[in-house]
């Protein structure tokens, strides 16, 4: 029974507060209810034992459920009160089969903190796979789903948890819930496959977005530390809950930041403990709940889904009497007094006051202004005439204008995206990014151009444009964070390396300021650089787009300052060749003859 009690404790105690009494399995068993209880256990097991089968885990989960009942009895077993991490690791290490099957021998030779670190590190090395591969057509999935809904969702949780061992359990369960909702909707439709294909694509995008946000936060924490994470979260939640005071928001954000390090390290026991403490304390504050409608609604969710609800909630209405604009100069004496004694408190108050007034702003715009304001306060607050000094220092910096200018920029990008086909816009992004970093591989630039297109396509759907700025800049910044972390920026070029090492809020602006790289020495532009044959006659739009992007990549790398007119000429010649050869009786022979001509003509154009 020790192993089974550990299975329960692994995840169930992981959502408990240290300040609560012992034997809290009973509390969570009651809060999460039976299905939530079993789901949490399944996530914890699958993430830590990726080479075990679902069949290996099912009987353990069933007995762990029985253990949960026993922990609610009048005489709970002693294992209900033992340390969860040590229990879990000891139980795993005592099973030779589990150790061998999951390659944990090295970890089990360690003890205490070293063993915990080894288990976390072992989990971190498991390959991630965010795709939601459909092994069966919609009709078969629907049949299985209708036959046994719980078993179907359980299989999804198992597979997704194994493929994503670093995702917090509450995120995995939110994703599983969403996938179940897709099937619930589509399995009642006459055209289930069409419905499934459409909704699955949307759902997959939402999954990628959520995971990108989590990963970006971890990257920011690793590179910039708690201070920047706290600033980001202060903006985010002040925008969502403008009715909360600065003091209330500050306390909440401190607790949020405390969860980041353990959650990003893969230490899900501590992660979920901290998250549970955070959500319980926030949801117990009746004063805040009475003023924050969105938070109040989320706190009515079950224990498993409350945290995800809070992260996804929309901004509440602003409080009555809140001025439209925040004027730092109106109370500069008090600002400087606070800044001199506790600069972080003063900067936090500034960020809060701007954020509650501007839910339409991105975090980055507010943080860019805050950085300028901080420099002004550093320069001026010790001076006798600090008020005039701050006015002079911030003369060219207006937060409202910054928000308007950035919003207008993205609206123009949206107009450009709407004016052309999806393929044309993605190709234009390929050209733009190849100009500034021709050293990058095709795969890298293909991903970047695809990401920019996907971000704008999603964010530009806000017809009024009220929230296009936070949507687009947040997602593009997440993409920059991932790119700078995935690749060695110095291997691309010094300009990209410089931007990746800029302050968090300035990275995107820095990249936009990069000019075409004229120092890059390109490879020879010849027919061997491109493979253009009968495969271009496919009707698969993705393959055609890929081929067109490869041609543009090769040409622009050869001359990063090539004109748009010359690119249009090459593109026209490419389509003419494609139409001619796809209509030819012997397509291969036609491409063999025409493709080298196109490359040769393109080479001549880039010399101009």
UniProtKB/Swiss-Prot annotation:
Which Gene Ontology cellular-component terms appear in the entry? blood microparticle; cytoplasm
Chief localisation class: secreted
Q: Which residues carry a glycan?
A: 501
The entry's keywords? Disulfide bond, Glycoprotein, Lipid-binding, Metal-binding, Repeat, Secreted, Signal
Q: Which stretch is the leader sequence?
A: 1-14
Give the intrachain disulfide bonds: 26-72, 71-80, 93-108, 107-118, 142-187, 186-195, 218-264, 263-271, 283-299, 298-309, 336-381, 380-389, 414-460, 459-471, 484-500, 499-510, 537-582, 581-590
User: Which InterPro entries does its entry note?
Assistant: ALB/AFP/VDB (IPR000264), Serum_albumin-like (IPR020858), Serum_albumin/AFP/Afamin (IPR021177), Serum_albumin_CS (IPR020857), Serum_albumin_N (IPR014760)
PROSITE patterns given in the database record: ALBUMIN_1, ALBUMIN_2
Tissue and organ distribution: Plasma.
Albumin domain mapped to chain residues: 19-205, 206-398, 402-600
| Alphabetized Gene3D superfamilies for the sequence | 1.10.246.10
Q: Which residues form the propeptide?
A: 15-18
Quote the subcellular location field of this record.
Answer: Secreted
GO MF annotation: an example: lipid binding
| Similarity annotation | Belongs to the ALB/AFP/VDB family.
Job of this protein: Binds water, Ca(2+), Na(+), K(+), fatty acids, hormones, bilirubin and drugs. Its main function is the regulation of the colloidal osmotic pressure of blood.
Name it.
Answer: Albumin 1
